[in-house]
Amino acid sequence: MSGTPGRPLSAELSEQLLSVAVDILADEGWGKLNSDRVAARARAGKAGIYRRWPTMAAMARSAVGRFTLVRTPADQGSLRDDLAALLDRWRRPLDREERAAASLVGAARHDEDLRAGLDAALVRPLAEAIGTIGARAADRGQEVPTVRLALLGSVIEAFWWQRYTSDRGAMSREEVSRVLDEVLLPLVAPDRENASV
């Protein structure tokens, strides 16, 4: 939040404004987020919005950047099972936070604030999860070379973005297993049987 000198900003109003912004992004999309709509829904003045965020992109960054859209799974005992737990989210429809983030994907290509919000919500948490999963594999004596781990992260991220831009909805358990066994595991262990990973 930016804010200007003067009266302190109300944290409660800030939260209310961000919640309204998330609702608009999730239900109507980035193109419908504007100060008039936010102010009307929040029953607040537009000045209160612009004291906090100079642009709607800055507001969207604050709203979405607070999310953690990827969670590092608990240790499942194997690389395959850790990855399966990470990808389990793909089996459910997009929730409110994911729909809000998804609404920014196309526009983020041309807007630094939107990109930063998505980086904070998805890109960095996913990279941390992949790093943790790779470290666990190494601790089990199944080290994944750094280059292959980076490739794994890039491919999973691409699938995540596809999930956000597709109208297809959730994947089935079988589809997730097929992606895992036929695409992801061969990236990290091309010479090993998947069952041993």
Please place each PLM-identified region on the residue numbering.
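Basic, helix-initiating cap at the start of DNA-binding domains
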Residues: 1-41, 47, 58
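Short loop-to-helix capping motifs
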Residues: 28, 97, 107-112
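C-terminal peripheral helix-coil segments that are non-catalytic and often amphipathic
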Residues: 1-2, 85, 92, 135-139, ...
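Short amphipathic alpha-helical segment with a characteristic S/N-K-E followed by hydrophobic residues
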Residues: 17, 32, 55-60, 70-71, ...
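Hydrophobic alpha-helical segments that form the core
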Residues: 127, 131, 144-166, 174-185
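Amphipathic alpha-helical packing segments from all-alpha helical-bundle domains
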Residues: 96, 103, 113-139, 150, ...
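Hydrophobic alpha-helical connector segments
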Residues: 70-100
